[in-house]
């Protein structure tokens, strides 16, 4: 949800964006394609018996249904994954990136931005490929102020730090996806500072976002003048203009829990 709105907001700035969904559920680009689920890279390769030479760019990359509303362009691709319970979930990410490279998608589409929407818990090496192999120059973590979500964010920070020497990957910051938790902005701001990074923007909790998801569109189609759209525009501007990067630290669950319990208090850190 958050990533598709960022892609739309960036394209509205006149940028050419490739949005690559890196989740076996292959639903990252759904709101950019009027609720449709495109054929995934992995499914396309399976149908061609993994003969990459038989795959064209048009087979796996699709223009957003809403490009006529943008001054830029949005292109969509979904990596895909195995059937539930079968195979490695990260295989689709590996195959997608290799196929896009083979087809020179990044050059032929004349892109300004490639956005990889990666599964939050880095439980498989395949999901970390955009970070590990240097495909992602900047990493942004979407997080609420909830304890378990912050722990997942901390683990991603650990992966960024681990791969920095290999790929130069750096953290651009935290995107606060608010869940109406008490003092949530304070918790997220302090969490970012604790890990040596920054919050680049906050997305308010909103029933409008749920409504748009159910209708298969972004907020920009139904509520273009809403405060929520304003938040996404501001966030996209912060990301595009950001020049502050970090090799973050991380926390164990025990340390995080102790810190989090104090951080929720007034002026807690």
Where are these regions (language model features)?
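Conserved catalytic-core segment of NTP-binding enzymes
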Residues: 12, 102-113, 118-205, 209-211
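N-terminal phosphate/diphosphate-binding loop that engages ATP/GTP or pyrophosphate donors
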Residues: 6-75
